[in-house]
Amino acid sequence: MARPISFVTGNAKKLEEVRAILGARFPREIVAVKLDLPELQGEIDDICKLKCLEAARQVKGPVMVEDTCLCFNALKGLPGPYIKWFLDKLGPEGLHKLLDGWEDKSAQAVCTFAYTDRPDGEVILFQGRTEGDIVAPRGPRDFGWDPVFQPTGYDQTYAELPKPKKNEISHRYRALAKLAEHFADESK
């Protein structure tokens, strides 16, 4: 039997969402591992690959890491991979106000999972994107920037959407669908 995949996260809500999206049919067990990984700067693909290799070195086995970006088109992709710090300093209201001087409120939610089976292994990336707009905060404020991101074609923010609906359309869902497909192909 294949070893479990260590998902590096300290965020219980993220783990819950990943397990809900992958479902019981996913062929590998996912276990949460909290590691102290360096906070890297750069492009998302590079950040994910380096974080994944460092996590695999520490775990000494199969790992996956996730990095999420919120890219404002008017700001040429910022805050991007630095959304965590923007949110910490500005809160949801501040994220919305960043675009006060811009007509363009469009954004992309981007999720990238990186997987490797060993410290010296190839890192495989699985990326999902959802288009939307940055709006005044609405809905519960218990999961990051969900209150300010309204996906295109919906009149509710991620925070307002029922969890099952969000999990069918989100950037994380799109990335995990690619990851699940990879493991389904691998198990054939």
From Swiss-Prot:
It comes from Anopheles gambiae (African malaria mosquito). Pyrophosphatase that hydrolyzes non-canonical purine nucleotides such as inosine triphosphate (ITP), deoxyinosine triphosphate (dITP) or xanthosine 5'-triphosphate (XTP) to their respective monophosphate derivatives. The enzyme does not distinguish between the deoxy- and ribose forms. Probably excludes non-canonical purines from RNA and DNA precursor pools, thus preventing their incorporation into RNA and DNA and avoiding chromosomal lesions. ITP binds at residues 9-14, 51, 67-68, 84, 143-146, 166, 171-172. It is an enzyme of class 3 (hydrolase). This is Inosine triphosphate pyrophosphatase. Homodimer. It catalyses: ITP + H2O = IMP + diphosphate + H(+); dITP + H2O = dIMP + diphosphate + H(+); XTP + H2O = XMP + diphosphate + H(+). Its main location: cytoplasm. It holds the Pfam family Ham1p_like. It comes from the Eukaryota. Belongs to the HAM1 NTPase family.
